[in-house]
């Protein structure tokens, strides 16, 4: 199965009639493995900041999480495994696997819990596969 199939079929899937706004699977080095049509163009330093927060949980909290220049307020995640951000009526969930970062971006009416479920389920599957 291609990485694009994971994005199209497993991240951009229907959840109680709702869908993520955008999603992507990105290597730890910032290389895009696959992305949905609406995934924003991020900056390399934003991925560096995200990777630093996984290594040193809480490092993004004072400054916020930036993705494509948009600031998200960092909310409770799972240290070293999941970063969650909130911006207005939407937000982002980022799950770290051994080799990749799984991004899910949502807007209402999708809920943070629905986004978390989709992103973390995919991330857990990839971890189980050794990825």
Curated annotation (Swiss-Prot):
SMART domains: PROF (SM00392)
Molecular function in Gene Ontology: actin monomer binding
UniProt subcellular location: Cytoplasm, Cytoskeleton
Gene3D superfamilies in alphabetical order: Dynein light chain 2a, cytoplasmic
Superkingdom, natural source: Eukaryota
Cross-referenced SUPFAM superfamilies: Profilin (actin-binding protein)
Alphabetized UniProt keyword annotations: Actin-binding, Cytoplasm, Cytoskeleton
Cleaved signal peptide residues: none
Pfam families linked: Profilin
Keyword Ligase appears in the UniProt entry: no
Assigned GO CC terms: cell cortex; cytoskeleton
InterPro entries (UniProt xref): PFN, PFN_euk, PFN_sf, Profilin_CS
Main subcellular localisation: cytoplasm
Function statement: Binds to actin and affects the structure of the cytoskeleton. At high concentrations, profilin prevents the polymerization of actin, whereas it enhances it at low concentrations. By binding to PIP2, it inhibits the formation of IP3 and DG.
Family the entry assigns: Belongs to the profilin family.
Subunit structure: Occurs in many kinds of cells as a complex with monomeric actin in a 1:1 ratio.
Listed name of the protein: Profilin-1
Organism expressing this protein natively: Lilium longiflorum
